[in-house]
Amino acid sequence: MTTLFNQPLNVINVGIAMFSDDLKKQHVPVIQLDWTPPGQGNMQVVEALDQLAEKPLAEKIAAANNIALERIIQSHPVLVGYDQAINVVPGMTRTTILHAGPPVSWENMCGAMKGAVTGALVFEGLATDLEDAARLAASGEITFSPCHEHDCVGSMAGVTSASMFMHIVENKTYGNRAFTNLSEQMAKILRMGANDQSVIDRLNWMRDVLGPMLRDAMNIIGEIDLRLMLAQALHMGDECHNRNNAGTTLLIQALTPGLIQAGYPVAQQREVFEFVASSDYFSGPTWMAMCKAALDAAHGIEYSTVVTTMARNGYEFGLRISGLPGQWFTGPAQQVIGPMFAGYKPEDSGLDIGDSAITETYGIGGFAMATAPAIVALVGGTVEEAIDFSRQMREITLGENPNVTIPLLSFMGIPTAIDITRVAGSGILPVINTAIAHKDAGIGMIGAGIVHPPFSCFEKALLTFRDRYFL
């Protein structure tokens, strides 16, 4: 006993963190065990987990989940073209505005989304100015709908209108297509809620110059293998959500022969290359559409508990589950925690927003941060934490994707197929790295960081799944 008290004190604390915090202040080594009971203590969730574990239902769920996992892994998305939304997006009309996240009314839209909507209405010529656009948006004459319900995804506010050029990504394995608009690059842009004349002028140029050049280039090239390019980008230090240095280089490399052969004036070619070089985010939307094409192939499988959508609109966070097609499970959008740009404070930030969490749903972004340790300079945290995120996400997924691997973790495949029962049982929430938009319209991006979905989304999904399938 005397020997015990003469040894250095090493502490593992389970439960309330205040005890470990006090020990840290006294310079005592301490490990805080981040543990929560199954279902975060909600006995309804615990009961539902037990019910779903009973045979023969558990066997049906396992079989369905194997199919979902296989469809995600076997999906082979390729870029096949670019065209205006009105020509390719299902359900698009001249008076339709698509947005990120689950359904949301004009009244409940956050500042960044309202800014993007009003800017898009001016861009489309449906309103004379931003004030007129706000009146029109509130009038009921504009149809608002989630991108995800139109085979689309949209970064940040995700606002997509008829004239905008879209990526066209085809899943060669299963034949479905996915779409997303072009990157405006970074900072003061529509998708972040900015909407002044400089933003509208850029959108006009993208419609009149960039979009047609990309369209004609792809008509020459035919297709670009995005799954292969994604695997290469991760091996080159990207995680393909918020760090895209390698991916953008690879994508413009593949596009360049077509852009040159398309026959546009040298001055316009230079404008396009300078635009791409202005930010590494050019390939960001490309990966989003790729992930969407793969995950849609796994949506609508009876008995499957796999998450096929995670999306946010600055007001709510929403999930969709393979075995419960057509339903959204929502909870309040969360505060993103991370470094702010100079001059901004956390209280300036809007809540979590964007469809870009489709990347994490697929297994990249926050799930693959071990491939991109340099990203911590943007989103905060340490290299060790970034690596641990990739390990931890394997605990809430059904498998690994051997087509897309993480060199630092002995070429482990990216964690693939989030399972609501594993999230509910472990209490581990998916990790998302993301940009931060200002809470007010008209300003734009003010930082980046880490965020998690609210547990209530998974709770609602699990209980609804139990009610649907447990007989």
Residue locations for each model-derived region?
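Anaerobic metallocofactor- and corrinoid-dependent redox/one-carbon enzyme cores
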Residues: T2-L471
